[in-house]
C-alpha cells in the first residue's frame, strides 16, 4: 500500500502541477501515450487494441517523453493496448519522472505480481488504474473480479503508488450490480474507486436505466479520491442530458498514439493528427479555443478532468482583473 511519505510527496507534486495549470493555459495538464497497441485480451467493447503490432522502440518513446517535457506537460499516463507488454516499460516510467512529470498507467492488471509491482515501485510509478468490468468473466470481458482479485491483493501488499479501481455501468454490462461489488472490494483493500459509463466507439452513450442509475449513485457514494470527486459531467449524461462545457482536448489533454501523432482522445483519433515532434504552443492555443462537436455527450473522463482545471481558473482570472482595475495589484 502507498506509504504516507510517498503520498505526501505525490500530493506536493500534484499541488505544484495544479498551481501551474491555474496560472498558465499554454501547456498540457495530462497526456496519454501509447507504447504498445497490442493487448493480451480482446474485450468486446474495446477499439483501442490489436493483436499484431510491435512495441514502440524505446528510443522513440524516450524522445516522445522528452517532447512532452518540453511542452511542460503535468501528468503522463501510459496506456494501450496493454502497456505492461512493452519490454522496456520501466525505462519509460523513469524518463517521465526524470523530466519532472507525474507518471501514471492504465493496465488490465493481468501481468501484476509481487516482483513486477516492486519493479514499478523502483521505476517511480505514481498512479495506476485498473478497470474491472464484471464479477465473473464472460464473452464480453475477461477483466473480472474473479480473475483479478489476487492481483489486487498483491497491489495492496506491495504497491507504493496510488491505485484506483474503476468499475463500469452502461450498455453491454449484463449485471450492473457487479459494478458495486467491484467498488466495495476495492474499498476493502484500501484503494480509491471510481465508476465510469460505458461509451460507444465515438465516446458517446445511451442514458442509463433506473436500475443502472441507482447502482451508479451507490458507487459514487462509496468512492473516494479525485477520480470520484470530479464527476459532475456524468450526472447529466446518465439522464440523457448534454453538458455545456469547453473541451480542451488537443490542449490541456493530448492523446499520443503509437505512431506518435497527437489526437483529441482515444475515441476521436485522426485530428489534429500532428506529429508530437512538431506539436507546438501554437497548436495548444488553437485547440484550447476550438469547440468540439462531440463534447455535449462525451463520456471520456480523463478529458473532462484535464479540462476542469480551467473551470476553476476562470474565477481567479476575474479576481485578478478586478484587482488590477481597483489598483489592488
Regions found by a protein language model. Give the residues of each.
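Conserved alpha-helical substructure of the radical SAM core
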Residues: 2-127, 320, 329
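Processing junctions and N-termini across compartments
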Residues: 33, 37-40, 241, 288, ...
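Radical SAM enzyme [4Fe-4S]-AdoMet core and its adjacent flexible, acidic
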Residues: 56, 102, 122-127, 131-263, ...
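Short, intrinsically disordered, charge-biased short linear motifs at domain edges
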Residues: 29-34, 230-236, 276-289
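Cys/His-rich metal-chelating microdomains
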Residues: 38, 42, 46-49, 250, ...
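Flexible mid-to-C-terminal extensions adjoining Fe-S/redox cofactors in radical SAM and related proteins
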Residues: 259-329
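Short, P/G- and charge-enriched loop/turn segments at secondary-structure junctions
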Residues: 18-22, 239-243, 284
Amino acid at each position: 500500500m502507498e506509504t504516507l511519505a510517498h503520498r505526501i510527496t505525490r500530493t506536493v507534486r500534484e499541488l505544484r502541477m495544479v498551481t501551474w495549470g491555474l496560472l498558465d493555459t499554454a501547456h498540457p495538464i495530462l497526456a496519454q501515450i501509447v507504447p504498445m497497441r497490442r493487448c493480451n485480451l480482446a474485450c468486446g467493447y474495446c477499439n483501442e487494441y490489436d493483436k499484431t503490432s510491435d512495441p514502440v522502440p524505446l528510443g522513440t518513446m524516450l524522445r516522445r517523453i522528452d517532447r512532452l517535457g518540453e511542452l511542460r506537460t503535468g501528468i503522463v499516463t501510459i496506456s494501450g493496448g496493454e502497456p505492461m507488454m512493452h519490454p522496456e516499460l520501466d525505462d519509460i516510467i523513469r524518463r517521465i519522472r526524470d523530466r519532472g512529470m507525474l507518471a501514471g498507467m492504465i493496465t488490465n492488471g493481468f501481468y501484476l505480481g509481487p516482483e513486477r509491482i516492486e519493479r514499478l515501485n523502483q521505476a517511480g510509478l505514481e498512479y495506476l488504474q485498473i478497470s474491472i468490468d464484471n464479477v465473473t468473466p464472460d464473452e464480453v470481458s475477461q477483466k473480472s473480479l474473479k480473475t483479478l482479485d489476487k492481483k489486487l491483493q498483491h497491489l495492496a501488499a506491495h504497491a507504493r503508488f496510488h491505485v484506483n479501481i474503476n468499475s463500469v455501468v452502461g450498455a453491454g454490462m449484463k449485471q450492473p450490480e457487479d459494478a458495486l461489488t467491484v467498488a466495495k472490494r476495492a474499498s476493502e483493500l484500501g484503494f480509491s474507486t471510481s465508476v465510469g459509463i460505458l461509451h460507444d466507439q465515438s465516446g458517446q452513450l445511451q442514458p442509463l436505466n433506473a436500475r443502472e442509475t441507482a447502482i451508479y449513485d451507490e458507487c459514487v457514494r462509496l468512492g473516494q479520491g479525485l477520480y470520484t470527486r470530479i464527476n459532475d459531467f456524468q450526472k447529466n449524461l446518465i439522464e440523457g442530458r448534454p453538458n455545456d462545457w469547453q473541451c480542451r482536448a488537443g490542449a490541456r489533454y493530448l492523446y499520443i498514439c503509437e505512431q506518435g501523432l497527437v489526437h483529441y482522445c482515444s475515441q476521436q483519433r485522426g485530428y489534429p493528427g500532428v506529429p508530437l515532434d512538431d506539436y507546438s504552443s501554437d497548436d495548444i492555443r488553437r485547440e484550447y479555443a476550438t469547440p468540439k462537436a462531440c463534447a455535449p455527450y462525451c463520456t471520456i473522463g480523463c478529458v473532462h478532468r484535464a479540462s476542469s482545471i480551467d473551470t476553476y481558473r476562470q474565477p481567479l482570472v476575474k479576481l485578478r482583473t478586478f484587482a488590477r482595475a481597483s489598483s489592488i495589484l
